[in-house]
């Protein structure tokens, strides 16, 4: 009899070890004329579960930024432990310009958390915030989970 859980683990391990062809963007496009800008942060927040968001205590940091607008989709790594990072100063300066756009709605998931990190990083987000974590149960209140 085959143990599917072991096979799943081995397949997952093999997939994790595969090389990928992803590379960090080499462009910093102007998104200030887009209809919407979607943004998601990846963070290192070691005491989140015990003490709450690290941005309140300067405990942790932004690791990378995923952003989309118009036809552009990109992920900007700035503090990954494994390397491959872009200049944090350059990325954050560009991000400030993109999010300082009061006429463009910003789409986020769990915006309260990401907005705290953006603010702590010196990025002032202007414009309407559309939070998919808030909107999802409004679309289907009977769904068990939105994770």
What are these regions (language model features)?
Residues 2-147:
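Conserved RNase H-like, two-metal-ion catalytic cores of nucleic-acid enzymes
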